[in-house]
């Protein structure tokens, strides 16, 4: 039914709950998980701003900014490692993707590139608003995705 599943995570508690549901899909024929983390464009822009300010004091601006982005990407990769191990232990083939940009846009881009049959996503992410039933990223992905979306309630 769902051979390839996209699992975008922002490392929130709700994303962790989604992982539990995701592992159960192996019994429904799921074989491959595309594990995605998006480094939000706001974070990249913040690095840019910080390093532009530092540029006037230090000529190594470009190296420092690139180094900061690499370090951030490696930190995300390290946070994904236990999730990869857990999914592999559950019998899945795992592809790891770390993208930079706006979460909704990147999730939909990866959905298309990896030809996924379903997306498993938490209803609320890191920036959850008290009382809201669904987060803005989850809501937009649910509306715009071409594949089935399993929205996991927190």
Task: Put a short name on every predicted segment.
Residues 56-75:
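A short acidic, glycine-rich active-site loop
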Residues 118-143:
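Glycine-rich, Arg-bearing micro-motifs that act as flexible, cationic patches
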């Amino acid at each position: 039914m769902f051979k390839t599943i996209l699992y975008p995570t922002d490392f929130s508690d709700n994303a962790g709950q989604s992982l539990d549901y995701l592992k159960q899909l192996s019994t429904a024929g799921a074989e491959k998980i595309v594990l995605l983390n998006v480094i939000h464009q706001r974070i990249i822009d913040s690095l840019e701003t910080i390093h532009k300010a530092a540029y006037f004091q230090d000529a190594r601006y470009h190296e420092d900014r690139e180094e900061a982005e690499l370090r951030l990407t490696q930190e995300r990769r390290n946070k994904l490692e236990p999730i990869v191990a857990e999914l592999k232990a559950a019998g899945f083939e795992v592809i790891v993707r770390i993208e930079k940009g706006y979460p909704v846009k990147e999730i939909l881009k990866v959905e298309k590139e990896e030809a996924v049959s379903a997306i498993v996503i938490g209803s609320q992410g890191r920036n959850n608003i008290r009382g809201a039933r669904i987060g803005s990223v989850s809501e937009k992905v649910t509306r715009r995705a071409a594949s089935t979306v399993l929205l996991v309630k927190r």
